[in-house]
């Protein structure tokens, strides 16, 4: 994973902050850490993969916090969810990303 562009991350952080204020939600470091890591990913991700990434980087963030933050980020349009025929949904960042299509290999279910 690489660092997100600072200008892009500042924009999405501002959007998220405004959303949290408007909804009267707390602005916690954990939520911003999750947002930062998501915007460091250049591909689709699943919640479990994100959790392991955060854990390996010594963040102390629970799965519940990740799931709750994912819901908030979906609501404010900063990420999108895809269902590619697997049990777990796949997510990707939405802001600052170019329109693209998804091709699914029906033999091995890869995207």
Spans of features found by a protein language model:
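Non-DNA-binding regulatory cores of transcription-related proteins
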Residues: 75-111
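Basic amphipathic alpha-helical segments that dock to polyanions
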Residues: 66-76
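Short helix-capping/hinge SLiMs at alpha-helix to coil transitions
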Residues: 25, 39-42, 56-57
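Pre-recognition alpha-helix immediately N-terminal to the DNA-recognition helix
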Residues: 32-37
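A short acidic, leucine-rich amphipathic alpha-helix
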Residues: 49-55, 66
